[in-house]
Amino acid sequence: MEKVWLEAQSNIKKVLTPQTYNTWIKPIRFHTLTDDNLTLEVPSKFIKEWVTEKYLPMIVEAISSLTSVKYQIEFKITEKIPLESKPVDNFTPVIKDNEPSKETNKNIDITANLNPKYTFDSFVCGASNQFAHAASQAVASNPASNYNPLFIYGGVGLGKTHLLIAIGNHIKENNKKAKICYYSSEKFMNEMINCLRYKKMDEFRNKFRKMDILLIDDIQFMAGKEATQEEFFHTFNALYESHKQIVVTSDKFPKDIPGLEERLRSRFEWGLIADIQPPDIETKIAILKKKSDLNSITLPNDVALFLASSATSNVRELEGMLIRLGAYASLTGSEITLNMARDILKDIIVEKTKDITVEMIQKHVAEHFKIKVSELKSDKRLKTFVVPRQIAIFICRELTKSSYPEIGEKFGGKDHSTIIHSVKKIEKQMANDLEIKNIVENLKKELIT
């Protein structure tokens, strides 16, 4: 059966990218076969969970195509440790207990720059960052085991630094003696230049090479800087060979960083590469809700949707908008509303709503309620038409720049007082009827996205 599994792996390899195959399928080994139960070995709980969720049907199909049997597949976490990256027993720090206290304390405060707010608990996980989040947790739980180095890449403001520091905070919380270094590549370079100037390179090298965990942010800034890359290369090798964990972030995939030396690029590809994509609208709303709770800001759902629907995918920019609204509300003693948000943020937010027309809203609402647009615009008083009409008018007022008279004209020439009545009617119903509120918010979300 082991030969069958090797052949199944070979077939799976043909349909996956090399990185995906090497990360998830290649480490799996045949264990036992009992009747219709096939047990495969995986090197970690993380791989077990990820493969079960993402690749189990593919594995079942690959094996059944060779054996004509659909086995019940189970994964067993093996106690074996991959030869490529052996962890130190019990993750023992570099410093020994019997060393002098003066030496023990040297450079320990290097972890002081780990922002305590950046934890896994405060990180909002969504489809766009699920892989990077899971990989970071796996590294933090078992440093220098299966994913060394860990390379996280993605655009500006998507959470790379948050995950990087969360790894450090988690390890620090569970191992007080662990020596953790978090540096930006720019800080690494500046410190190296300083030490070169004052002939303290031995001190510089010892400082980094005595670390248990090295966290380097924005590695792309080393590109084109030969001396810095040379020094980092030797630091990387020293730590890797000592089975110390290395985590690096970048705004690009290693191969896409111009000016990055091939020897560094290849080393980054030794471990696991995880990307963070721009968050979808649901994740952005979840982030805003989490941040508003942490900052004791009352953020209405429609305002959260408005912020999340802005053109930006930069999480830091979203947080900045939230803090700005919270500060204004606090200083003026007012509640945050959609109109306030539009006014306060008009200089920085780009609304997608500018592209939404009354006609688009009419068509979308009519399709949702399974009526004709002509019926939506008519004067028919049946509830079947009145409620959708009022909802459509309300959304037109929310998502377009059209005035009451302009909206009335698009709804069969209705008087502006009728339009105002419809808007107020839906506002009142949304405050008292959760079903109506959900319908309106979902329709708005569908139109915006």
UniProtKB/Swiss-Prot annotation:
One of its GO terms (cellular component) is cytoplasm. Residues 113-329 are annotated as: Domain III, AAA+ region. Residues 330-449 are annotated as: Domain IV, binds dsDNA. ATP binds at G157, G159, K160, T161. Pfam families: Bac_DnaA (PF00308), Bac_DnaA_C (PF08299), DnaA_N (PF11638). One of its GO terms (molecular function) is lipid binding. Residues 69-112 are annotated as: Domain II. InterPro entries: AAA+_ATPase, Chromosome_initiator_DnaA, Chromosome_initiator_DnaA-like, Chromosome_initiator_DnaA_CS, DnaA_C, DnaA_dom, DnaA_N_dom, DnaA_N_sf. The keyword ATP-binding applies. Keywords: ATP-binding, Cytoplasm, DNA replication, DNA-binding, Lipid-binding, Nucleotide-binding. Residues 1-69 are annotated as: Domain I, interacts with DnaA modulators. GO terms for biological process: DNA replication initiation; regulation of DNA replication. It comes from the Bacteria. Its main location: cytoplasm. It is found in: Cytoplasm. Belongs to the DnaA family. PANTHER family: CHROMOSOMAL REPLICATION INITIATOR PROTEIN DNAA. Plays an essential role in the initiation and regulation of chromosomal replication. ATP-DnaA binds to the origin of replication (oriC) to initiate formation of the DNA replication initiation complex once per cell cycle. Binds the DnaA box (a 9 base pair repeat at the origin) and separates the double-stranded (ds)DNA. Forms a right-handed helical filament on oriC DNA; dsDNA binds to the exterior of the filament while single-stranded (ss)DNA is stabiized in the filament's interior. Domain I is involved in oligomerization and binding regulators, domain II is flexibile and of varying length in different bacteria, domain III forms the AAA+ region, while domain IV binds dsDNA. Oligomerizes as a right-handed, spiral filament on DNA at oriC. This is Chromosomal replication initiator protein DnaA. It comes from Geotalea uraniireducens (strain Rf4). The gene is dnaA.
